[in-house]
Amino acid sequence: MLSNHLQNGIESDNLLWSRVPESDDTSTDDITLLNSHRDGDGGVNSLDYEVIENYAYREEQAHRGKLYVGYYVAVKWFFSLLIGIGTGLAAVFINLSVENFAGWKFALTFAIIQKSYFAGFIVYLLINLVLVFSSAYIITQFAPAAAGSGIPEIKGYLNGIDIPGTLLFRTLIGKIFGSIGSVGGGLALGKEGPLVHTGACIASLLGQGGSTKYHLNSRWPQLFKSDRDRRDLVTCGCAAGVAAAFRAPVGGVLFALEEVTSWWRSQLMWRVFFTSAIVAVVVRTAMGWCKSGICGHFGGGGFIIWDVSDGQDDYYFKELLPMAVIGVIGGLLGALFNQLTLYMTSWRRNSLHKKGNRVKIIEACIISCITSAISFGLPLLRKCSPCPESVPDSGIECPRPPGMYGNYVNFFCKTDNEYNDLATIFFNTQDDAIRNLFSAKTMREFSAQSLLTFLAMFYTLAVVTFGTAVPAGQFVPGIMIGSTYGRLVGMFVVRFYKKLNIEEGTYALLGAASFLGGSMRMTVSLCVIMVEITNNLKLLPLIMLVLLISKAVGDAFNEGLYEVQARLKGIPLLESRPKYHMRQMIAKEACQSQKVISLPRVIRVADVASILGSNKHNGFPVIDHTRSGETLVIGLVLRSHLLVLLQSKVDFQHSPLPCDPSARNIRHSFSEFAKPVSSKGLCIEDIHLTSDDLEMYIDLAPFLNPSPYVVPEDMSLTKVYNLFRQLGLRHLFVVPRPSRVIGLITRKDLLIEENGESSAVELQQSTSVRGRYSETATRMDAARPLLDDLLG
């Protein structure tokens, strides 16, 4: 019992430690989300990843048999299957739409410029403008939470932050159709980050049975009522999004593990890997189906996979220095990109976007016009180059036939045997432009002047575009930027080491990895993704080298891109390491400014309503008194649970005396206390109480958490931070140092051996643990090994 741990009573000024210890707000875990998309009251709350083991929960668990446990496990795996299928189909739809819009746009433009370049430019600009306008209109008018990549918001959700609107059905729709418009409209952004958000939305909607607002819900799948279960599903959705975007199932698993999740369990690894595998099957099936030509312009190049298996087979020791230089350049440009996007986004939010949705739409349209003018106009200023003699041997046609786009684009050239190298990059889809930069056997296809021009202009466009009111990812733009300066370095190496068999495309690949490492600061997952999308395992050591260097250089200047954006949006992430100044602080110092409101075990309904209406605390310590008058803390009750009790009224009683929870018939199931994702949940204004109701009482003992986590007041704040984050807590009690110890648990008290070979260890175990295990072992027979592996 918690009361045995708190013999000396409590001090109301240092009882709770919440997610933001430096907050001056009296609300311990209600944090205002500044300058963000608001839905409802505009704030964010912490999620309850800790299982509230109250009497209602324990009674429900006691009545669950093997059949229910098997059903529970089966539904988890079935939902993992549905998440993989749903995310894969969403990715196919997005890519099919983007490729066809881009194909029709370029085909029409190339057809018109055969007669008039000005008319072709007008058509090209108008098509891009319509697509971008549709994307911005959908976001501003229908789904404001779908703007941006969505990864900082999902990372915050998996870190324990409930951000309104992030996982709604309309956010999913806005993300899908908004991505089609923004990417198809030629903006300097990608669809990979939005696909991660899309997978998370699909997972969340499946976990709650659909959307109640749009009457697209069902009761039978509403099994996962706890935030802990929903967190696992959203993790599967994030991995599925990466797997669908890059056709990299292993990379998707590692991305979820390295970048977005804060808590990871071995059982979750099974389902995440299974979900990513399902995505890979769905995507490859769709790709094979589209090879027959029924998908229009969408074919083999629809998903961003760039096969460089025919590139450079080996490397020389002399090449390590220029490769290290690529890593340094990636770290510098990545850190600069993060800082510039921070300034641009901050200015945009504080000045421009405050003027309303119309300004957001106009801004996106202006950027679309500028991007179209640059991508069409700059190649006109570049002189065409004659086709190289080695092109026929490589199997690549030079120039491309009219109406085609790819390598060696004939754009504003005087003769048919010429190509425009700047148009080959600019006047193309991003996927095909990257494929051109990565391509082997295309020595000297691009001039240094064209690559420098493209690098400067596209880098600027990527900075300016990031933060507009459209869905935007930074994976592909980052690959574009990195592959450009990587190919530049490769050109220098080719000219410096004339006799070596060096491919410029290999250096372009290393440059892409270096920029992503310098901007996003991912290592393991990004390394695997780059290997999977390029189908070249031989380059793995080189990719690892440039990633390590670029990350180290970038970390010397600022945080990663997603951390910077999360901080800008006011998402209170708990990072893996506490801040340095916490080493000099203790737990008591972190919560001295807080005003903690305690509730008695049996409380008047009027007092509960008054307390809930006068503050926004989400957790309340519940106290009781011994016969000698000593104050004891008996647990923690959540605000959401109190609201459910007030609304139902079935637990009201006339007597102010406590009842025996074990002998009481609990009239609530544990799932009734869960807050749905797609709605704001209950608030005190939604509850109507009569004057007779207000005079009645509630015994809180059956509904409180009798065993919350507790730390002494003089524990170091770094230790408190690690405990709070690793356990996924929402509240943590800070109490005076207890005066009495009732026991000491060691490793041997928690070990239970099931075979006779380890009897020596078993004899050392706690008698109570072994006795309890012997009572339950007969009930957990043959089904247990399977359930232990699958349940979680």
From Swiss-Prot:
Membrane topology: Multi-pass membrane protein
Cross-referenced PROSITE patterns: CBS
Family: Belongs to the chloride channel (TC 2.A.49) family.
Subunit and partners: Homodimer.
Main function: Voltage-gated chloride channel.
Stored PANTHER family: CHLORIDE CHANNEL PROTEIN CLC FAMILY MEMBER, H(+)_CL(-) EXCHANGE TRANSPORTER 7
Protein name: Chloride channel protein CLC-d
Organism per entry: Arabidopsis thaliana (Mouse-ear cress)
Gene assigned in the entry: CLC-D
